[in-house]
Amino acid sequence: MIIAEDALGDGADEKIPITLRGWVIWGVAALFYLYEFFVRVAPSAMAPELQETFKLSAAGLGAAIGTYYIIYSPSQLLAGSFLDRFGAKNILVPASLVCSLGCFLEVLGHDAFLLSAARFCQGLGSAFAFVGTMYLAAEWFPRSTLALLSGLTTSLGMAGAIIGNSGIAHIVEKLGWHASIIAAGVLGLVITALIYFVVPHKGRHHLEHATTVQSVRRPGIFSALRIVYSNPQSWLVGISGTALYMPLSILGALWGVEYISSVTGGNKVAAAGAVSMLYVGWLIGGPIAGWFSDRTGMRRNLLLGAGVATFITTLVVVCIHSLSVKGAYVLMLLMGFASTSQVVCFATAVEHNPKSVSGTAIAATNMMIMFLGGAGEWMFGVLLDHFSGGGVHDSYPAQAYHKAILLLPAISAIGLVAAFFLTEPSRKKLVLPADAALRVESVVWPKISLSRWLHWLRRWYPGKKDNPC
């Protein structure tokens, strides 16, 4: 994909003017990213309603909601290749449509399989949102603005998460969860139409500058994955990043509203507002962490410091059994700010691997983080069921939440150990800056040509002339 390193030459980059049309095209795609983040975290504001409707235990709900990540994680690995081959419009339109149709599917019945299928569709469509947005940014803007556009795109994603928590809680309280999800589906159809009418079939300078990527010989998909995953540092980066992301996944995406309501005694709207502070912390801290890491050259030490801060804040959450709503706001903000240095792990993964697999390193790291994040939601639900006696509950006792939340500091401790054994990567080669790599989910994937497949087939299944039998 053309947002990779060396994809655009510096001289050619200066010829790309910033136009109003470019801003509109990027803005429509970024709106899809805001929407998918909203859909991703919306279940946290309606967890009891979903459990009651689909007759699910906490573990069952966690597994059904986590289906989103199961398809999202591997799909984003291929997003770059699909965009390169078919173009942004031909990918983003069906992706947005599938994501919105997943919302309508969610309200069609009361079967748990239906909920899983709906989340599967939402995750499949969402996998292309951020990558497609940055693809268009690289097509319509100078390379020197990509870090800014990456930060702005991520900020919109965090805004979608805030709306998906506190905003939808008001709607659910007044109209019910069915109406809220239907409204989300209609909004998705509107965004699909906007993408169809606004985004062009071909980028302005795609034909001029995309050839640079193809001129560089890169390993095949499976070879690149083998290079990345055979590197112990890649696993340490992924584990450290997962530990920093886990509070956002467990509390931000699913269980936070019910947990805070339980420990504070506040209503769901107030609890959703507190959970939104997690995303505000990321919104503020992400660009700062990326800028500081690039400025000082720190990768390993910043991840280690973030691991310590996250472990302390999660430990505070465990130790405090009685908390006011205002206290929950402050604690969630601090936890979000502490864990936001997770954005640095993408640049760290790039620097710990050969330049030829930089895109693979970013995508593979993100796949690990998102997959394990979904598993974390399920594990929390299992613990919640165990400590509350099992079965389906309208609400879980505060004591069960206090015990289940021990999962967070335990995972933080594992991430802290992983960060400790990380080495500071070499800064000699050209890499993506940390803030530009924020939430980058796929960069470059080489295409496997038909001739290569035929070559493999001839090698393993020779013809009669070469077969002594």
Language-model segments: residues:
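Extracytoplasmic gate region of multi-pass secondary transporters
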Residues: 43-45, 231-289, 373-381
